[in-house]
Amino acid sequence: MSPLPRTPSARERISLQNWRERPQSTFSFHNVREFVGTQQINKSENPRHLPVDLISKTELQQAAKLADLDDFLIETETDALTILKNGCLAFDWRADHYPSEKPHIVFSISKSITGMLAGQLQHAGLLHPDRLVRDYLPDMLPEGYGSCTVQHLLDMQAAIDFDENYLDTTGAYVRYRIATMWNPPSDAAPKDEDLRTFLLSLRCSASSHGKVFRYLSPNSDLLGIVLEQAGSGRYADLLSEYVLGPLGCAHETYITVDRAGTARAAGGICLHPHDLARVGQGILDAIISGENASIPEAWIQDTLSSGNVSAWDNGEFSGLLPQGNYRNQWYISDRETPCLLAIGIHGQWLYIDLKRQIVIVKLSSQAEPVNEALDAKLIRFFSQIAKSIG
């Protein structure tokens, strides 16, 4: 008898070549370690309980001024929507394809979490953001990253000759992704080049450091390496000890690593939406109480008030947040009545309304890496919810 023809499963159709494409991403974004090397981040020994005080879907729908909330979330390719109000779980929604306990990649929200780690190491006296990168990493050359300060990395003001082009298939950005092991090897990159070697190869642009906001993910990956040197430990261990553990993160968490074990601090953190909400709530708690085991008050005040307004106004994202700013790897929505935002490609959001004590997490498997019109629409969506239920 002839064997029956075998039909490949949905999982078998996903590879390192296509894991960030939809529909593959509806599986891969919460199963990243099946495709990329990872390091575990230990969860808290004292997980934070989230009290439940739910609002109904109808209430949230009315608050957001939507005809149908489910339709909106599906249309915007949402995987999870979690809302905290005054520290309580107020709303929790999942797409059918996203199991509730799986960690989800948050892409560049990782940068903001890395910024929190930098703040904690600074508070401990281990990191000095005004020092040059080469003070921590002597192999970083002055004609490259060695000539900028750690604060330039934190604020996306390093003048480096690099183009953040997510759709690049032949240039420096695809070489960067191959170095992080997010893309399969190809002729676009030297054989066996790792992340640190790639970062060493980058050179300064014609501009000066500290003048203009220019969003470059390599800045944050290099920041992660600086933090390892300053904190005398691996990134994942430092993050668990100084940030996620004290904040009471309760679920499995991990970060992608390259072939040398270097963490992808710019975009590789995978965590549960409730734990991302705990990160946001930790910031609110620190503002309310003036102190927090993981988030120094001085770091929060510096983040809210010390950004370079001129650099932001002359930068590439000022159209999205015309009255905004960027400091310590966090977006500030409005300089007068600030909300803090952490944003990742393919639709990852952490929105913290400081005045109304609202935290909103939206994780997605959005087909496009960046959709500026949708980003603006979602900021209005978050703002409307916070104003209505806060």
Where are the language model's segments positioned?
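Structured C-terminal helix/loop/strand segments within mature extracytoplasmic catalytic/sensor domains
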Residues: 1-12, 339-390
